[in-house]
Amino acid sequence: FLGALVNALRGLL
């Protein structure tokens, strides 16, 4: 599930 969280953070950036 870490990948999903990182993906969301990258989306914000």
Swiss-Prot record:
Key words of the record: Amidation, Amphibian defense peptide, Antibiotic, Antimicrobial, Immunity, Innate immunity, Secreted
Modified residues (Leucine amide): 13
GO cellular component, one term: extracellular region
Keyword field contains Secreted: yes
One GO biological process term: defense response to bacterium
The organism's place on the tree of life at top rank: Eukaryota
Expression tissues: Expressed by the skin glands.
Subcellular location: Secreted
Major location category of this protein: secreted
Purpose of the protein: Antimicrobial peptide.
Similarity remark: Belongs to the frog skin active peptide (FSAP) family. Temporin subfamily.
Name under which the protein is recorded: Temporin-1To
Lineage: Eukaryota, Metazoa, Chordata, Craniata, Vertebrata
